[in-house]
Amino acid sequence: MPIITLPDGSQRQFDNPVSVLEVAQSIGSGLAKATIAGRVNGERRDASDMISEDANLEIITAKDEDGLEIIRHSTAHLLGHAIKQLFPNVKMAIGPTIDNGFYYDIDLDRSLTQEDIDTLEKRMLELAKTNYDVIKKRVSWQEARDTFESRAEPYKIAILDENIAKDDQPALYHHEEYIDMCRGPHVPNMRFCHHFKLMKVAGAYWRGNSDNKMLQRIYGTAWADKKQLADYLHRLEEAAKRDHRKIGKALNLYHMQEEAPGMVFWHNDGWTIFRELETFVRTKLKEYDYQEVKGPFMMDRVLWERTGHWQNYADLMFTTQSENREYAIKPMNCPGHVQIFNQGLKSYRDLPIRMAEFGSCHRNEPSGSLHGLMRVRGFTQDDAHIFCTEDQIESEVTSCIKMVYDIYSTFGFTDIFVKLSTRPEKRIGEDVMWDRAEQGLANALKHNGLEYEIQEGEGAFYGPKIEFALRDCLDREWQCGTIQLDFALPGRLDATYVAEDNARRTPVMIHRAILGSIERFIGIITEEYAGFFPAWLAPIQAVVMNITDSQADYVQKVVKQFSEAGLRVKADIRNEKVGFKIREHTLRRVPYMLVCGDKEIVENKIAVRTRKGTDLGTFSVEEFVEILKQQVRKRELTLLGE
């Protein structure tokens, strides 16, 4: 007679074993209809699963994050159901969930076309709208293998042979005549899987191994209702419009080419944005009392062996040889900073030492993972390392957190998710040290009034870390900032300081990055602003243009006044209609268009309009120079009149 305890603390007693769905029915028909699955003592279970002992139960519906994931997983099975009907000889591999959707890897003797995808999506919807029940059956390992042998499914057999113990009882999910194998849980009925779309087809090696056969991977998205699906597709459309690769080309910011994969060729306007970001961060480095240093691009293999990178990171490192010595081009700045710290005797009175670098790093990322500025091989880190005592951890982390939020807010990012990653199973150091480190990070977050999610066991082997993820205007998350405690590297590289008792001690090192990669951050803000950079970041802050040739000299005089004030302004005195010039520079997203006609010459003024088409009227040249200088100095996000 199981007693079921519900989330509100109430209890229900049953005379016999009871399913998750039956418990929901005992509460109410509305809840039963909405039930997708349940959490039994915290473990996700199918709605049909029986509970025979006392347990805590939470009902999972489409409103839950888990519910949405289950819908997506079941929609992957729906895809399998449909494709087996359309292509009976297809071999099914794996179909997991991913962010915002799912995919299924298939082995088919021909490439799928867009017409095939459209037909497949139509068949999926036809099947889903019959609202058939999904039946779960636990069977013996041998029965499962026999089932897939009879259906000529070699990939399912391989999963059984390689991943499932012979004394296990795998779950088979029956979608009418289609059978799939999965840990589950899955929806009890296909009425939950009506809102989906197939997105694209790509290639994928079986087991992710390039030695294996190339399969076709069908990607899809699935949501709980029609509005969620429509909103997501709208966000994708907006993301396509804001794609930093398209905008970068349209605004002539940078380019990339086959001869240098993953490397950026910065054009003048893109490099202007890059340098403005560096200048801004440098002002913050001074404000927060950092030293700026510069380490070498490559160092001897011996050093990388001492740090552990050669053993654990070699696949991502570019190497070269000279005079019978092997070198690695640095993938990160930290070993070089320890070398700088090691020059000269350090006392506890010298700590903390905050060392920052705009370090040019290189990582041999797989070519298939490269993506514009978001994933590159050559990048610049706004990296810093703080050498401190254990007693200084909390105060230094607090300072880092303040700096992170200070910088992000300047760009308009205020929706920030914080995660605290704690000790992994394999780690160095005593538990007492980890207790102190994790508590120091947690205290710093609490003292700053920050809510955070704990990621158990996700810290590095050498220390816990804080991660900062930005949410952008399209509801996407970008993991940028990190604060990482490191108890290993200073010791590996013999970093010491003289403590108050005259003993030699190893400092704690705090790795700190805010923008992360400057290249990637430019990609992020390009999409956030859709190329409409605020005036302080815009490569050209204003264009001064004439109406007729008679105003050309006045235009040059105005440009000189702005340039002497340190502003990025250029003249457009081409023999073109002023409307044509305005349209052209509007497409270039130049913040301000300054028009000079005969009237403006007489009054020593300029007519000002914004790239959004707002007519701001006329200003004296001196007046608008000061307005623009103030916008740049304050790093304002909006233009005048917006």
Curated annotation (Swiss-Prot):
The chemistry this enzyme catalyses reads: tRNA(Thr) + L-threonine + ATP = L-threonyl-tRNA(Thr) + AMP + diphosphate + H(+)
Which Gene Ontology CC terms are recorded? Answer: cytosol
Where in the cell does this protein reside? Answer: Cytoplasm
One GO MF annotation is: threonine-tRNA ligase activity
Question: Record's Pfam families?
Answer: HGTP_anticodon, TGS, tRNA-synt_2b, tRNA_SAD
Q: Which residues make up the binding site for Zn(2+)?
A: 334, 385, 511
- List, for all copies, the residue spans of the domain called TGS: 1-61
Q: What is its EC number?
A: 6.1.1.3
Signal sequence bounds: none
NCBIfam families membership:
thrS
- Known partners and oligomeric status: Homodimer.
The function of this protein is: Catalyzes the attachment of threonine to tRNA(Thr) in a two-step reaction: L-threonine is first activated by ATP to form Thr-AMP and then transferred to the acceptor end of tRNA(Thr). Also edits incorrectly charged L-seryl-tRNA(Thr).
Family (UniProt):
Belongs to the class-II aminoacyl-tRNA synthetase family.
Name by which UniProt lists this protein? Threonine--tRNA ligase
Q: In which organism is this protein found?
A: Histophilus somni (strain 2336)
